[in-house]
């Protein structure tokens, strides 16, 4: 009796027939693992830029000090002629300055060049007398006295220079949030005119944590 026509034989034949365009399970698994690794890497990269109470990129990939957080403000220098200067006092939001006795540990400046940036700038942060009008002469003198660190930021073909952060440590000075109005960010355009849309300065002020309101605004 010919058993080739039996149902079992027919099912076996169908199971063994290769499907067109199919991939092996091991190949599909390897592709899925590679894609998963890429997604995890991308998510980790994106997470770096998300602000949190302990921002991972606050100071050279360090976290804020225990019990501290930070407030960021953004400065966009106007057009600065070659060899000239710009100064702007720090102005924190009212929601932060209401707690003016909270201590400030560090100030960090991060430079974000925009696509047309092709210049060299010097950037610093200084405690400035309230009587100072931040004139060109006054700012020039502060750059030259050596009393604060200066970040020299130059054009990089890649668009972002690796060294784009300046850290100013205030922990020994016992400075507080109320003192921040006495500090200013200063910029010197060394080699060329700096257009108003060439760089953005992100100023991070690390300070003791402040209470968070849990009431909705009226």
Curated annotation (Swiss-Prot):
Q: Which GO terms describe its cellular component?
A: ribonucleoprotein complex; T=3 icosahedral viral capsid; viral nucleocapsid
User: Tell me, what does this protein do in biology?
Assistant: Capsid protein. Probably binds RNA and plays a role in packaging.
Q: Which domain of life is it from?
A: Viruses
State the domain notes. Answer: The N-terminal arginine-rich stretch does not seem to be the major RNA-binding region that allows formation of an infectious ribonucleoprotein complex.
Gene Ontology molecular-function annotations:
RNA binding; structural molecule activity
Could you tell me where the Basic residues compositional bias lies? Answer: 12-22
What keywords is this UniProt entry annotated with?
Acetylation, Capsid protein, Ribonucleoprotein, RNA-binding, T=3 icosahedral capsid protein, Viral nucleoprotein, Virion
Residues annotated with N-acetylmethionine modification? 1
Pfam families (alphabetical)? Cucumo_coat
Which protein is depicted? Answer: Capsid protein
Q: Which organism is it from?
A: Cucumber mosaic virus (strain Kin) (CMV)
Q: Does the keyword RNA-binding apply?
A: yes
Q: Which family does it belong to?
A: Belongs to the cucumovirus capsid protein family.
Give compartment(s). Answer: Virion
Which residues are connected by disulfide bridges in this protein?
none
Region Disordered, residue ranges: 1-30
